[in-house]
Amino acid sequence: MMSGQELAEVVQIAVEDLHSDHHPVELENHEVTEEDLSPTLKRQRIEINCQDPSIKSFLFSINQTICLRLDSIESKLQVLEATCKSLEEKLDLIMNKQPNPIQVPMVAGSPLGATQTWNKVRCVVPQTTVILNNERQSTSVTKLEAHEESINRTTETLENMLNSAVPGRRHNTIVVKVPAPEDSHNDDDNDSGSEASDTLSNCGNSSSNMGNNVTLITLNSEEDYPNGTWLGDEHNAEMRVRCPITAADMLHISTNCRTAEKMALTLLDYLFHREIQAVSNLSGQGKHGKKQLDPLMIYGIRCHLFNKFRITESDWYRIKQSIDSKCRTAWRRKQRGQSLTVKSFSRRTPSSSSYTTTEGVQNTVSSSSDLQQTSPQALHYALANAQQVQIHQIGEDGQVQVGHLHIAQVPQGEQVQITQDSEGNLQIHQVHVGQDGQVLQGAQLIAVASADPTTGVVDGSPLQANDIQVQYVQLAPVAESSATAQAVEPLQTALQPEMHIEHGAIQIQ
């Protein structure tokens, strides 16, 4: 028989078996305490006890590389942030910058004041923009709508200015943008610098607020010089200029000029007489009050050199310096009273007209058919009222006396022309010109002068040693006392030893 203790153990075991598959019953208000929760299993701690130094150094190098890479990324981000700020400042500057006003277009007229016409040079190309000098290119930014609107406003301003300046103009104008004039170099005469050589002078009606870095050039067409040739690429309407140089002369230039600089200086002599070079330069600036060489012809020379020799902007800069130097040389020869005649032109093919310049204006002087029949015309000069020609008179003792041949008063509808034939002889004519610029009557020969007394012939009589020698045209105003109202009377004789006229219309001082 079991004892009481054994019976209690059997009952306890039976009770545990009955409740082994059932969860303990929890009352509704029962609170779970920490004691009721079963303890969580702890993760076994694994200790890594590695004493290998190579692994430690490898891990250290990886850590160091990652840190350096992060520092590099941080520095690049700082540089990028600074660049963004700089671009924002430049963009704000561009958006707030007011566009420079455009200069008025140039008009044609006589450089010596004889004929003041207002006919613009004809052009056959559409409106486009031509960059003469490559400007420094800044960092390109995205085009914004506001910037495009400012460009449109500038274009509208240009159109309005052109319409107001030249009524009835053709819509075929080349907009030439050139850099603003900078400080010129210190040279012998301090007349011009190549930095400002491409800057085109104001022509026509200009206002005080106009900028100096933009002007207009109207290209001409083939019908302006039917017997002439093209400077530049004749197949590119934007890179060509029609000039009065004949095909034979152009072939001669292309054959003999092996370098770009020599061709530029040769074309300069064909397009501008030495007398014009002496009183002009590329910029039209300087202490001597020089005029500007015709920008249209200078642009034609540039196009010709770029087409023939594929020159660069640095080459063109050097060539411009040579052109300015050539003009200064002619000016010094003029001051010393030396001859300005180009010897190589004595036997070249004469042309019917030539380019001269005053403030970048084209001049083409018409000549009569009678004048063309008497002698071939190579160069034309026209004198108006209050103009004079400086001459050298060679006396019997061989001494040279400097004087001035004054045109005291030219009657209305008349003008005086100085022409030079292919032999280098200078002839002074009086012509009658109508209001439309056409020659009404044949030109009357007033005087003939030559650098070589043996070559000049007047009505079969050679020039004598005491005859005058016309050196160059001087664009200096005549005193009002000498500008009388008397008309220039034609001379019956072609040349007089003393060039004395009774009425004082033409006199030597």
Swiss-Prot record:
Sequence segments annotated as region (Disordered): 178-207, 339-370
UniProt xrefs under InterPro entries: BANP (IPR042343), BEN_domain (IPR018379)
A Gene Ontology cellular-component term: nucleus
Keyword Transcription part of the UniProt annotation: yes
Subcellular location per the Swiss-Prot or TrEMBL entry: Nucleus
Domain BEN stretches: 238-334
Low complexity bias: start-end ranges: 347-358
Polar residues bias spans: 359-370
GO MF, any single term: DNA binding
Coiled coil: 68-98
UniProt keyword DNA-binding present: yes
Alphabetically ordered keywords of this record: Cell cycle, Chromatin regulator, Coiled coil, DNA-binding, Nucleus, Repressor, Transcription, Transcription regulation
GO biological process: chromatin organization; negative regulation of protein catabolic process; protein localization to nucleus
Annotated family: Belongs to the BANP/SMAR1 family.
Cited function: DNA-binding protein which may repress cyclin D1 transcription by recruiting HDAC1 to its promoter, thereby diminishing H3K9ac, H3S10ph and H4K8ac levels. Promotes TP53 activation, which causes cell cycle arrest.
Protein name: Protein BANP
Organism annotation: Xenopus laevis (African clawed frog)
